[in-house]
């Protein structure tokens, strides 16, 4: 019995000695966080349905903000990848699920009314206040640029319209949580375009690509290009989401492409 006990101890000791050992005394300089972007969404349905879809179906987000009190629910740990952005691209980087945090905001999106009119649904003040607090926390922890806080329609303009034209990007910019074009520069550039022929479609496509949008470079005003123009307008010109470039759209493209951003008053 004593010999069996000694043999057992020897086997146990040998197993411990042969276990994996990793030295963590050194750290490489060449590394960064998985999280490079935040992508904002609306759920296009009510809270209960949103919660079900984001927890029981093969779609998810890291956070869900409900619509009454602005309660923030964490559904996926930030170290894990959530399935929220889908087929996506920004500034040449694709499949942003792997490099982003997704935030879903409970909102019906839009309702199609008679004669083809679209009614967009507003966000509650409680939701926006909660979102601002959450974004400030995420931005600080991951040292994110305000340029990398995006809408789903920015990264997937051919498929998505969220968070929509009623989303308060300008207000987020006041909090340092989004970029906003220099309004004086936009006004000056608009005055120039008011007096001359507007740029052609190839120019528009080039500016959109410089900003970060995945857009065809065909010189043709095709359906994909119109959708990308609408995505840009929803973000920076929500009063004119038509897919048609007017003098203000052109001015905004110039100012945003050259990254002439300011904090709005």
What are these regions (language model features)?
Residues 1-4:
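Positively charged n-region of N-terminal signal peptides that target proteins for export
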Residues 12-15:
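C-terminal motif of bacterial Sec signal peptides marking the signal peptidase cleavage site
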Residues 20-145:
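Active-site-adjacent loop/helix surface patches within enzyme catalytic domains
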Residues 58, 67, 126, 130-137, ...:
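Extracytoplasmic/secreted proteins, especially bacterial periplasmic and envelope-associated proteins
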Residues 64-65, 165-189:
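Acidic, His- and aromatic-enriched active-site or binding-groove loops in soluble protein domains
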Residues 89-92, 115-126, 156-159, 190-197, ...:
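Second-shell loop/turn segments in exported
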Residues 144-159:
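Acidic/histidine-rich, metal-coordinating catalytic segments
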Residues 193-256, 262-265:
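Short acidic, glycine/serine/threonine-rich helix-capping segments at coil-helix boundaries
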């Amino acid at each position: 019995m004593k010999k069996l006990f000694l043999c057992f101890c020897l086997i146990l000791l040998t197993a411990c000695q042969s276990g994996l050992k990793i030295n963590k005394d050194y750290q490489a300089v060449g590394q960064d966080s998985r999280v490079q972007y935040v992508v904002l969404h609306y759920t296009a349905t009510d809270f209960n349905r949103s919660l079900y879809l984001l927890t029981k179906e093969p779609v998810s987000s890291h956070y869900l903000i409900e619509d009454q009190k602005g309660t923030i629910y964490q559904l996926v740990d930030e170290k894990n990848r959530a399935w929220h952005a889908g087929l996506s691209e920004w500034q040449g980087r694709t499949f942003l699920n792997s490099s982003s945090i997704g935030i879903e905001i409970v909102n019906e999106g839009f309702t199609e009314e008679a004669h083809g009119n679209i009614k967009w649904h507003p966000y509650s003040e409680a939701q926006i206040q909660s979102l601002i607090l959450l974004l400030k926390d995420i931005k600080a922890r991951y040292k994110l640029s305000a340029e990398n806080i995006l809408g789903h329609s920015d990264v997937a303009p051919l498929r998505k319209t969220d968070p929509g034209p009623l989303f308060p990007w300008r207000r987020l910019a006041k909090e340092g949580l989004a970029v906003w074009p220099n309004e004086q520069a936009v006004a000056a550039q608009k005055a120039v375009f008011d007096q001359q022929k507007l740029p052609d479609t190839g120019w528009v496509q080039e500016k959109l690509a410089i900003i970060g949008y995945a857009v065809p470079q065909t010189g043709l005003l095709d359906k994909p290009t119109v959708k990308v123009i609408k995505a840009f307008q929803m973000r920076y010109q929500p009063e004119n989401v038509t897919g048609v470039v007017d003098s203000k759209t052109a001015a905004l493209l110039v100012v945003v492409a050259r990254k002439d951003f300011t904090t709005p008053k």
